[in-house]
From Swiss-Prot:
PANTHER family: METHIONINE--TRNA LIGASE (PTHR45765), METHIONINE--TRNA LIGASE, CYTOPLASMIC (PTHR45765:SF1). ATP binds at K333. A motif ('KMSKS' region) lies at residues 330-334. It is found in: Cytoplasm. This is Methionine--tRNA ligase. The gene is metG. It comes from Borreliella burgdorferi (strain ATCC 35210 / DSM 4680 / CIP 102532 / B31).
Length: 734
């Protein structure tokens, strides 16, 4: 059993001020690290700023400064914001530290030595005026999708992922002249060559069992569709130099060097860094990331470590979260919309309130919209009327009627039988990084404490049954002490204040939960929080809503907040069709990839690429009807275009089977759409192109041999026959 917890949060990019959504990862890792330390586990929480790459170089140009000066500026801004939010890093460093270059270059040399690096000639935009190759963010132009101005990697308006060559009327961001395409050489990490070792690691029972569902589904879908070689070099100046002849003027792509930053940042601060990073048998690596970073942490970084063929500590526990958004608007400093870290400091709202609200709504399984009205309601009802109220009413009652001294108490077994079983449940939720659920379970205990106080009516019984009333209040005081321990990972300043009421040195250990000794006296009390007022919230909402006037804000405030249910997402975003496999070919570049030639009812050949080697032979699939995600954005796998993705079911024992629509039972028609059972006879729109993450959010499951979403059957649109999963009766669909 592993004895040490190495905790990391995704390294924030250091060319901007972090907003509330950016803070989710560092706050999540902070809560887990605090829990781990309270549990007596040796713990190291590592984070730092990701400083190299195109975004930094271009931002430095805009601010008329050097990349390093820009990083120095924003590093201090990040540090001050994290300090105000009371994020307790053990190490908070930078990827521009003195060890980073050596470690990154050493990883590269090991990968090259072991045969995992390839060289390839490509075409890239080149600016004749500035005499330089242009990385993606150095190119701007018109988005082909929405015609807005966009950078060469992604359109900020419609979120479409782009290559610089996709842009209409591309221009150099520096001189605004039109670039030309020019050949250049780059180095690639040969992910397909590492794939077998990677899959063996992922299939190990001790690996992915500790990953959350979305991360695991996305990783498996990515693997199934085949890994591609990935460029690791760029034509930039700001970055780690490539230690290879002929590549002296190139640097490593930031995605290659950034995850290695966890290691270099640790080495830069502590001497025994190898006891953490080269100790896979003893160290549990727990990583907190956003959904946009999943593949970098489940595929790219592990491949770098595995390919080096050294005993690196590798990912064991992964907690990925969805997006925290703002009032149906985008976080934008320039437009004045959204709360950024420095804004939170000036609102006059304490950091523990911000922490509480972010944890309470941590986007663990779906995106969450920050709403000012919801902030006020959740804080006033759950944090103040529930938790803070229990602390105040119990301690005030004790001091008013029984004095400051806490007498030795008689244990009320009936009281504690309601409470103590819940402690283990909460600690287990912490262990599994289900932080939102842990917080809500703690609040349930607080609510139960209020109910016990109310039901026993101590204000009535204190005269007729003074001893019993004393015992009740004393037991409630120890409950408050326990709640201060459990709430410590979420609201540390408030938890410390509660323990100061008892005059003790801080006792933040899970080992004393449920014990009934150690509190002698109440030294002082005070109100923990003041309620948030509607007027203040209205003013803050207006202030951080950009150019919208108060009327628009009030209208938005009255709109119902509709959570995107999986069945609604499926109906509006996902297009499943039945297709018939007419022909199967092998990719000459990757024998594990099947190229499936499909009949989709349009009399045009359609093809998808899927990694089915080891699962099926060609004979088992040829002529079968299967289901594909028909509106998935096209992709290339080892040079072969794939126009969709087949769907399959997987059970808890990792058994994997393609969903096959039986001719004799279900009477499928090639091209027939798959719909929800309650959408029969409806005129359904054809949804837009989506990425794989959007499909996975539909949460299709196999349940008792039938495919369902939220309990609703999927059926064939024409025959109305249910979609079956005979081989995997119960499992997830990916």
């Amino acid at each position: 059993m592993k004895k040490m917890n190495l905790v990391t949060a995704a390294l924030p990019y250091v060319n901007n001020i972090p907003h509330l959504g950016n803070l989710v990862q560092v706050l999540s890792a902070d809560a887990f690290a605090r829990y781990s330390k309270m549990s007596g586990i040796e713990t190291l929480y590592v984070c730092g700023t990701d400083e190299y790459g195109t975004a930094t170089e271009t931002k430095a140009l805009i601010e008329n400064t050097t990349p390093l000066e820009l990083c120095n500026k924003y590093y201090e801004i990040h540090k001050s914001i994290y300090k105000w939010f009371n994020i307790e890093f053990d190490i908070f460093g930078r990827t521009t530290n003195k060890n980073h270059q050596d470690i990154v270059q050493n990883f590269f040399l090991q990968l090259e030595k072991n045969g995992y690096i390839k060289e390839r000639e490509t075409e890239q935009f080149y600016c004749n005026k500035d005499s330089m190759f242009l990385a993606d963010r150095y190119v701007i132009g018109e988005c082909p999708e929405c015609q807005s101005m966009a950078k060469g990697d992604q359109c900020d308006n419609c979120s479409k992922l782009l290559n610089p060559t996709d842009l209409i009327n591309p221009k150099c961001i520096i001189c605004k002249n039109k670039p030309i395409l020019k050949k250049t050489n780059h180095l690639y990490l040969d992910l397909p060559k590492i794939k077998t070792k990677l899959e063996k690691w992922i299939k190990n029972p001790d690996t992915s069992k500790n990953w959350n569902t979305n991360a695991l589904k996305m990783t498996k879908a990515f693997l199934r569709d085949g890994l591609k070689e990935r460029a690791i070099t760029r034509d930039l100046k700001w970055g780690i130099p490539v230690p290879k002849k002929g590549f002296e003027n190139k640097v490593f792509y930031v995605w290659f060097d950034a995850p290695i930053g966890y290691i270099s940042i640790t080495k830069n601060i502590i001497k025994n860094w190898e006891s953490w990073w080269k100790n896979n048998d003893q160290v549990n690596l727990v990583q907190f990331i956003g959904k946009d970073n999943i593949l970098f942490h489940t595929i790219i970084f592990p491949c770098i470590e595995i390919g080096s063929e050294e005993n690196w500590t590798i990912l064991n526990q992964l907690s990925s979260s969805e997006y925290l958004n703002y009032e149906n608007l985008k976080f934008s400093k320039s437009e004045g919309t959204g709360i950024f870290g420095n804004d939170a400091i000036t609102t006059g709202i304490p950091s523990d309130i911000w922490r509480f609200y972010i944890y309470y709504n941590r986007p663990e399984k779906s995106d969450f919209q920050f709403m000012w009205q919801d902030l006020m309601e959740r804080v006033n009802t759950e944090l103040i009327d529930n938790f803070s109220n229990l602390v105040n009413r119990v301690l005030t009652f004790q001091r008013k009627f029984f004095g400051d001294v806490i007498e030795t108490i008689e244990i009320q077994n009936k009281f504690w039988k309601q409470i103590t079983p819940k402690y283990n449940k909460i600690l287990n939720l912490f262990k599994k990084t289900e932080l939102k659920s842990a917080l809500k379970e703690i609040l349930k205990i607080s609510s139960l404490g209020n109910k016990i106080f109310q039901d026993n009516e101590p204000w009535k019984r204190k005269n007729n049954s003074p001893q019993e009333t004393k015992e009740l209040i004393s037991n409630l005081i120890y409950l408050i002490r326990d709640l201060s321990i459990l709430m410590m990972p979420f609201i540390p300043e408030t938890s410390k204040k509660i323990q100061q009421f008892f005059g003790n040195s801080y006792q933040f250990s899970t080992k004393i939960l449920g014990t009934k000794s150690g509190i002698k006296k109440i030294e002082f009390t005070e109100i923990l929080f003041n309620k948030l007022e509607q007027k203040k919230i209205n003013n803050l909402k207006l202030k951080y809503s950009g150019d919208k006037n108060m009327k628009e804000n009030e209208q938005a405030e009255n709109l119902p907040i509709a959570k995107e249910q999986p069945e609604n997402l499926f109906r509006e975003k996902v297009l499943l069709r039945v297709v018939k496999i007419n022909k199967i070919e092998r990719n000459p570049e990757a024998k594990n990839l099947f190229i499936l030639k499909l009949d989709d009812g349009t009399n045009k050949d359609k093809q998808i690429v899927s990694g089915l080697e080891g699962y099926y032979t060609e004979e088992e699939l040829l002529g079968k009807h299967i289901i594909i995600v028909d509106n998935l954005k096209p992709a290339k796998f080892r040079g072969i275009k794939s126009e969709g993705m087949l769907i399959a079911a997987e059970d808890k024992n990792k058994n994997f089977k393609v969903i096959i629509v039986e001719d004799s039972i279900q009477n499928p028609i090639a091209g027939e759409r798959i719909i929800l059972e309650n959408d029969q006879n409806k005129d359904l729109a054809c949804p837009p192109k989506i990425d794989i993450n959007k499909f996975l959010k539909a949460n299709i499951v196999a349940e008792n041999g039938e495919l369902k979403i939220n309990g609703i059957n999927l059926i064939l649109e024409n025959s109305k026959n249910k979609i079956l999963s005979k081989d995997i009766p119960n499992g997830t669909v990916c």
